A protein has these predicted regions:
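Metal-dependent amide/peptide-bond hydrolase catalytic core
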Residues: 168-172, 179, 185-386
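Acidic-glycine-rich active-site phosphate/pyrophosphate-binding loop
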Residues: 77-92, 163, 180-190, 312
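Glycine/serine-rich anion-binding loops at beta->alpha junctions
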Residues: 95-111, 197
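Residue-level recognition of beta-strand->loop/alpha-helix junctions
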Residues: 43, 133, 292-294
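Short beta-strand segments
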Residues: 69-71, 132-134, 162-166, 190-192, ...
Length: 386
């Protein structure tokens, strides 16, 4: 049997701080090639962005096709001297594996790799199993999963269902399965006035006043009341600034940044219209500009045979899974355009923290859940796949 702990240790020992590959995908590639997978390494780049390593590995052919998606890049470890165990040593202590990426999400990659190696050791699947792994999830997410999906489609790959190994669990492995995510829309609102002395406000035009009124217009009334699957959409102002450090100067310009996490009652286009309508009414003639960042759309994988199969695989481990759409975004936001997708991974309590770790028992539990999914998947979807 494949040793999930050894695989996780090997991955953690690769210093793959985003966007560096650090040897993690090279290790995974060698591991899967030895098991009979066809492995393709792809690098993508774009102006002003770092070049990123990506990996696609596949065994079997035809349909149904189950894809596991994940990322080998990790966030920086911070002050390494603050760690009780070095962040890239993969040390084990008190029944836990320590290291950057243990929870998010090298542990889950190791679990699916171990499950897939055990499953395919008995013969190729009646369909296909693949890995879609990027080094650009913790970064801008421009040269990673999105482009790898485009590349896979161009070569004729068709995915039927996907699992993303993000750390979704709250207390016990498998207790939470993400079947959707809220969309995310960020923007910068700039309001223009006229600089002047605070003692002579009649000679100036303070942009802070209309800015405050416009922010109140965005926040005082909810965008919706939520849905059965999603909590209500929410806007948070994240910064307000004028570039002015003096107490006696009225600034010429004031800016605010905000983010909206929105449910499936909206898409980014409809939400922009609502935002702009509120701002126009509150501005009362003030000059302003609104600049958006690239949005992420919301999505929902509705309950059906695939979600039920994943829920039953978790139940076999003695855990009742809750279906959730809470939390932040993941690369599932790209995959949902190709096939139904769920997020299922380890407990994420220590992700991105000093001394990030995962219990060894949790790695074993997740491996067993993934293996059950593989064991049931091809019989369940062999007829329904087209």
């Amino acid at each position: 049997m494949a040793n999930v702990v050894e695989i996780a240790q090997a991955l953690i020992r690769c210093r793959s701080v985003t966007p560096a590959e650090g040897g993690a995908q090279r290790y995974l590639s060698d591991l899967l090639i030895r098991a009979g997978f066809d492995v393709q390494r792809q690098k993508f780049s774009s102006p002003g962005m770092p070049e990123v390593d990506n990996l696609f590995a596949k065994i079997g052919a035809g349909r149904p096709h189950l894809v596991f998606a994940g990322h080998t890049d990790v966030v920086p470890p911070g002050n390494e001297s603050s760690w009780c165990h070095p962040p890239f040593a993969g040390e084990i202590a008190d029944g836990k594996l320590f290291g950057r990426g243990a929870a998010d999400m090298k542990g889950a990659i190791a679990a699916f790799a171990a499950a897939a190696l055990d499953f395919t050791a008995r013969g190729k699947p009646r369909g296909a199993v693949s890995f879609l792994v990027t080094g650009d999830e913790e970064g801008p997410a421009v040269n990673g999963t999105l482009k790898l999906l485009h590349w896979a489609k161009a070569r004729g790959e068709k995915f039927d269902h996907a699992i993303v190994g993000e750390p979704t669990s709250v207390k016990r492995v498998g207790d939470t399965i993400k079947i959707g995510r809220r969309g995310s829309l960020s923007a910068t609102l700039s309001v223009f006035g006229k600089q002047g002395h605070v003692a002579y406000p009649d000679r100036a035009q303070n942009p802070m006043r209309p800015l405050i009124a416009m922010l109140e217009a965005l926040t005082e009334k909810p965008f919706d009341s939520g849905t059965k699957e999603f909590q209500r959409s929410n806007l948070e102002v994240t910064s307000v600034e004028s570039g002015n450090s003096a107490f006696n100067v009225i600034p010429a310009e004031a800016k605010a940044r905000f983010n909206v996490r929105f449910n499936d009652k909206h898409n980014s286009a409809s939400l922009k219209k609502t935002i702009e309508k509120r701002l126009k009414a509150a501005a009362k003639g003030a000059r302003y500009r609104l600049d958006y960042e690239p949005p992420s759309e919301s999505y929902l994988t509705r309950r059906g045979p695939f979600v039920d199969l994943v829920v039953k695989a978790v139940a076999a481990s003695g855990v009742k899974a809750a279906l959730s759409t809470s939390g932040g975004t993941s690369d599932a936001r790209f995959i949902k355009n190709y096939c139904p997708v769920v997020d299922l991974g380890l407990v994420g309590n220590t992700m991105h923290q000093i001394d990030e770790h995962v219990p060894l028992e949790d790695l074993q539990r997740l491996t067993k859940i993934y293996r059950r999914i593989l064991e049931k998947y091809f019989a369940a979807f062999a007829v329904s796949a087209r």
